Amino acid sequence: MHTPEDVAASYARLTAAHGDRFLLGIGVSHAPLIDADNPGRYRKPLAATASFLDGIDATDQPVPVDRRVLAALGPKMLSLAAQRAGGAHPYLVTPDHTHRARAALGDGPLLLPEQTVILTDDADEARKIGKDWLSAYLALPNYANNLLRSGFSADDLAQVSDRLFDAIIAWGDEEAIMRRVSEHVAAGADHVCLQALSADPTAFPRDQWRRLAVAA
């Protein structure tokens, strides 16, 4: 956990060293992670985020509103992102969520969804690489609740159904990945952040990054 003062000071150091290149992402995390060491600490995430932003704004070197984005999924956090930040950076979402997020944010704020990708044409290989990875996130209530709001069923989440897997993880060749990116853009995304998974989760997926860079 970081204090508003720590975050504002780190932002100031980064911009002083590297210019106006850094966009600060702020997220409230998840109850199972926060409460693991301090049970009961995770309460009222919307109010906690607003209070954290108040703290940043009260520092000697506040982070400009347009240089910070919120890890927003639900309508209330998206509304806060529109009011108090430069936009939203949703994680583990579909193009349909991007469409709803754009409607919630309005035309001005940035919308920067994450899209997980696996560069393989083999469905079995894609599922072998991505299913356990996805299962870990489905155990976190914030993501699970957002997917339930998005029309997936409890069975989809419990079984990591093919329908859910294919909606959250884009797999295939570069053309297939770019089609998914285009769907997000058509739904209102300003930028799509690609996270590449590979057979070795401990290795940087440099080959995948290079292939995606050429395709993009």
Give a label for each model feature.
Residues 1-216:
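Active-site-adjacent structural elements that line small-molecule/cofactor binding pockets in enzymes
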